[in-house]
Amino acid sequence: MSTMKIPLLLAAALAASDVLGATKAEFDARRSTMVEEITAEQAGLPGPFDPRVKDAIARVPRHLFVPPAQQPYAYENRPLPIGHGQTISQPYIVALMTDLLKLGKQDRVLEIGTGSGYQAAVLAELVRSVYTIEIVAPLATEARARLERLGYRNVEVRTGDGYKGWEERAPFDAIMVTAGADEVPRPLIRQLKPGGRMVPRGAGWEHSVAHAD
């Protein structure tokens, strides 16, 4: 399915949601405020975020990627628990890591650490295909169903050890490692296209980009 059809499916899902009395318009307003907060927080960086990244975050309904008890807080610029000892990342970090990848519309992206699927949805708004791996089986199952329900047909979810990558789908234009790692797993580097970009997250790797030779 073309990503052009995603907004129509999202609109239907949003219209059907009424969390603790909040309306679609109220969620939209909260999301706009969140994007403004992200913009303000990145003011100290060398350059502004790509407008496409901010537009993608403005389109993805974060409240549908967290448990019902967390939905009133979905548009606060902070991580939230999603169960199984995991969290959904702070929106600013989602924007930063996405921006660092310098994505193109035809890119194929591998994400390590699906979580609730929120980061994958943001990536799907920007690229041709997203392949995402989650080691916690219940989270992978929930994320797959959620992304399908919201119309993200250009996302494929796999249950497994993300540090081994996804050789059958390689090579990738970009790889995002959202699960913390002390060093970049070698299989991931091998699965990058020449000139590909990787944003790892972990000790010594925050806010950095690795490039394939």
Cite the ranges covered by each PLM segment.
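Sec-dependent signal peptide recognition
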Residues: 2-10
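SAM/dcSAM-binding transferase cores
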Residues: 9, 19-36, 172, 190, ...
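Class I SAM-dependent transferase core
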Residues: 19-110, 121, 126, 141, ...
